[in-house]
Amino acid sequence: MLNSFSNAGIFLIQSIFDLYIFILLLRVVLQWVNTDSHNPLFILVARLTNPPLRPICRMIPSLHGIDFAAILLLLGLEMLKIAFLVWLQVNTTPHFIGLIVLAFSELLNQLINIFFYAVIALTILSWVSPLAHGPLVEILVRVSEPLIKPIRGILPSISGLDFSPLILLSLIHISEPTRPY
């Protein structure tokens, strides 16, 4: 039985892991969509993720714009987080295959969330300040546009209203994996 002190510790550990995994996954997404390397937000993400990635990048190079070192680190951190939390909560270690499946599921869910919230933020921003531009807007456009563009090709604007973000958000919501726990 876990007491409230243990629950607070578990929450803190999970939050720290989740925050760093999110930043690292954001780095992978920003590299994938070819974000400008001079963007201040990209520079911040790169500075936060470079220290553990440098030694791994020497062994595992990027290929076709995909940072395999970051993906390997993501998978390792997610597996470590899950194993550590399972060990703290039920005092056992999970099966390795189950750990890999859960880690992939969690990473896929977080990746989908990045796209989902980027589209929502860009949509709200287009209502509030349609002519806004800046480092954050550039990133939101770069992350959202590869997903919205094919839908715009199928469903053009109707009377000046663009329904493609709504369609995309519905598709993202439908495709979101269910958690096994």
PLM regions: where:
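Hydrophobic alpha-helical segments of integral membrane proteins
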Residues: 5-12, 41-60, 100-107, 111, ...
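Hydrophobic alpha-helical transmembrane segments
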Residues: 5-28, 63-71, 109-116, 163-167
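Alpha-helical transmembrane segments of polytopic integral membrane proteins
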Residues: 22-26, 35, 81, 117-121, ...
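Alpha-helical membrane-inserting segments
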Residues: 25, 56, 76, 80-88, ...
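Membrane-interface helix-loop junction between the first two transmembrane segments
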Residues: 26-49
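Membrane-interfacial helix-loop-helix connectors in multipass membrane proteins
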Residues: 86-105
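Alpha-helical transmembrane segments of helical membrane proteins, especially in multi-pass transport
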Residues: 108-133, 138, 144-145, 165-168
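Single conserved hydrophobic/aromatic residue that forms the stacking wall/gate
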Residues: 173-181
